[in-house]
């Protein structure tokens, strides 16, 4: 990290203000080459003219110097706050590179902040998630994680396991001594308690991942029951072609939109039927796949027709999926003939009004909100599961008083927990994670 890096910290394009950021041991010296100043006072905003290396004036703006270690990265940082637009910031960035800085890689500022102890990995992931969040509830969850709630949760469990490991390794050196009975029971309780905590947070985070990424909602049913009409009604524009001809939708259509404070991804699928042609059958296979990957299913039936084997097959597929499902009986403006009793079925006329379905969805999504700590990435979920399983294995080894293997399992749990906040094997994990961050962050 000896090089001084530079990047545009604001979005590329037209705007009122652009920020060009430098970080590194030579950030101040490099910046002063573009300023006719002898120094900059740390943490003071200085209005200054900004020049090229060839003394051509580039802009006039605010320059702020953050002296290490009191900065985002823990290194010296200088920020140029200039007039917005593409060319001004590009010219300043190019001159800083001419002056000795290097263009930063995506996420390199955040990576340096992590390596310098300014944030842990959980906070870094939450920060990136917050930047890309598209719903109010996601922003709330990620803000809480940025404040350190997850780091504290993991740290407390890790501390208890480390303390136990230190004691057990001492006991291994004195193998002739028996473990005190009261300590044995306390340790067993600690292992079970923390294993359950980790398993619970991993399960909750998997089940409610839609709070952060958006819930996937699949609209399924036979051809020509009104699935596309419902989609168009939700979006308030004609996204899908609506026709009386069966099989009009042959591929799945996906759109993002918000229901209340929640982001959802709605999937309109091809109608499920047994006598489909080859191309349509591919669409039907996508429909079945959509059921498997969806968080919520909207099963649409034609209320003006008696049920048939295809309706029963759709109900069977949904029942086997164990997913939250809403049963919708469409075409309520026509004589009702559907003869299968469906608990909580919603009767609508999609061509007139589908708002009752949106209200039901909004009500259900609110029940998924939680004040509990959540994991924001698959990596965190996997690490929690690994730590939980290691503690379970340690419990079994402790029962058999196999202290060496018990200590090994505790070490496995500690390593899994550390990977959430401060991984032992840093380089590969960090390179992969920070490469997805914004340039200049």
From Swiss-Prot:
A GO BP entry: tRNA wobble uridine modification
Residues where GTP binds: 224-229, 243-249, 268-271
Presence of the UniProt keyword Nucleotide-binding in the record: yes
PROSITE patterns named among the record's database cross-references: G_TRME
EC code: 3.6.-.-
Chain positions recorded as (6S)-5-formyl-5,6,7,8-tetrahydrofolate binding sites: 21, 79, 118, 441
Enzyme class (EC, first level): hydrolase
Keyword Calcium: no
Disulphide connectivity of cysteines: none
UniProt keyword terms in alphabetical order: Cytoplasm, GTP-binding, Hydrolase, Magnesium, Metal-binding, Nucleotide-binding, Potassium, tRNA processing
Annotated TrmE-type G domain residues: 214-370
Family matches, as InterPro entries: G_TrmE (IPR031168), GTP-bd (IPR006073), GTP-bd_TrmE_N (IPR018948), GTPase_MnmE (IPR004520), MnmE_dom2 (IPR027368), MnmE_helical (IPR025867), P-loop_NTPase (IPR027417), Small_GTP-bd (IPR005225)
Molecular function terms, GO-annotated: GTP binding; GTPase activity; metal ion binding
Bound cofactor: record note: Binds 1 potassium ion per subunit.
Main location as per UniProt: cytoplasm
Residues that hold Mg(2+) according to the record: 228, 249
Needed co-factor(s): K(+)
Subcellular location: Cytoplasm
Subunit structure: Homodimer. Heterotetramer of two MnmE and two MnmG subunits.
PANTHER family reported in the protein's UniProt record: TRNA MODIFICATION GTPASE GTPBP3 (PTHR42714), TRNA MODIFICATION GTPASE GTPBP3, MITOCHONDRIAL (PTHR42714:SF2)
Family named by the database record: Belongs to the TRAFAC class TrmE-Era-EngA-EngB-Septin-like GTPase superfamily. TrmE GTPase family.
Biological function: Exhibits a very high intrinsic GTPase hydrolysis rate. Involved in the addition of a carboxymethylaminomethyl (cmnm) group at the wobble position (U34) of certain tRNAs, forming tRNA-cmnm(5)s(2)U34.
Protein name in the entry: tRNA modification GTPase MnmE
The organism's taxonomic lineage, starting at the top: Bacteria, Pseudomonadati, Campylobacterota, Epsilonproteobacteria, Campylobacterales
